[in-house]
Regions:
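Short arginine-rich
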Residues: 116, 168-173
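Terminal amphipathic alpha-helical/low-complexity segments used for targeting or macromolecular assembly
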Residues: 1-65, 181-184
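Active-site/ligand-binding-proximal alpha/beta "capping" segment
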Residues: 153, 167-168
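Conserved G/P- and acidic residue-centered "switch" motifs that form tight phosphate/ATP-binding loops
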Residues: 160, 178
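Extracytoplasmic/periplasmic beta-strand context in beta-sandwich domains
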Residues: 152, 173-174
């Protein structure tokens, strides 16, 4: 299996069966991601070097406007799309097997978790995983210690309050918060 074939498989939302070739390839990608994130996280790097390492991690060039404060963790890396003027603060953890799209102007606070996989609820198949993408619209601000769960789309201009657990799609230009996250108010432009 190669990367293209793997991404086509998971981006169709097909279940990853424990022990399958897709599952084994997922583990190969995790090993590569750990090597790159270890280099990223264990020492000081100028912004250009951070962008270079992040580009290597995701397999495509990040824009010169991209900013990241390490440490940063991911167990895949190759299914992340990052727009322009994106900033990711320290301690974030991205589980991107299901796909993460971060559009232009997004700000991501400290210790945010983006999780794109769920395990099977059947205890006899618990090792199986279901990928679902996360899409973060333009100019979204995700507050520190928030968790975004599989399949969530966050509409442009919205704010996710610190500590929120987002389980459902978020409309454009709103503030949501809480566990689970609920509507707080509309943002007037």
């Amino acid at each position: 299996m190669d990367l293209k074939e793997y991404l086509e498989y998971v981006n169709q939302g097909k279940k990853v069966i424990a022990g399958s070739r897709e599952h084994n390839f997922m583990h190969e990608l995790a090993q590569e991601a750990m090597k790159i994130t270890t280099a990223l996280n264990n020492g000081y790097h100028e912004p250009d070097k951070i962008r270079e390492l992040m580009s290597k991690l995701i397999g495509k060039e990040v824009d010169e406007s991209f900013g990241l404060f390490p440490p940063f963790y991911t167990d895949c890396g190759k299914n992340i799309e990052i727009g322009k003027n994106v900033f990711i603060n320290a301690g974030c953890k991205f589980q991107d097997q299901g796909g993460i799209t971060i559009k232009d102007g997004v700000l991501i606070g400290h210790n945010v978790v983006l999780a794109t996989l769920n395990h099977d609820i059947n205890p006899n198949k618990r090792g199986d995983m279901q990928p679902k993408p996360i899409v973060i619209g333009e100019n979204v601000w995700i507050g520190s210690n928030s968790t975004i769960l599989p399949g969530v789309t966050i509409g442009k201009g919205s704010i996710i309050a610190a500590g929120a657990v987002v389980t459902k799609d978020v409309d454009e230009n709103v503030v949501v918060g809480g566990v689970p996250a609920k509507f707080i108010k509309k943002i007037e432009e």
